[in-house]
């Protein structure tokens, strides 16, 4: 009986030793400089049915691209999702979240260069963009590779 247990244990140990190797994890972070979103501001009309975002996308590898991005809604455009909008080589979309409670809302953009298969997700709090002020300092984001 003891020899049977030993043989079974040896077989289990041998089978795990020869199992197929697990592939290494692959980083999806791109080997390019961070992208800087420059001079971003949001201006909403008095009825909050339209908000215009203006900003630049600077990859530090080409001339910066200026973007004007308008989000329209029947109400609360400052909290509405928007896009897609094309700005030069980029496709821009956005979504607002209030997940952290009252007065802690924020908007996250997806800035995608499909030709280079790169994306960044810049995010700005409602406080940063209130009353049409320009966000300062500019914020930079590490691009990720699209699969």
Swiss-Prot record:
Coiled coil: none annotated. GO terms for cellular component: extracellular region. Induction: Induced during growth on maize and banana roots. It comes from Hypocrea virens (strain Gv29-8 / FGSC 10586). Residues 1-19 form the signal peptide. The gene is TSP1. This is Effector TSP1. Homodimer. It comes from the Eukaryota. Stimulates salicylic acid signaling in host plant roots. Keywords: Disulfide bond, Secreted, Signal. It is found in: Secreted. Disulfide bonds join 44-51, 67-87. GO terms for biological process: effector-mediated perturbation of host innate immune response by symbiont.
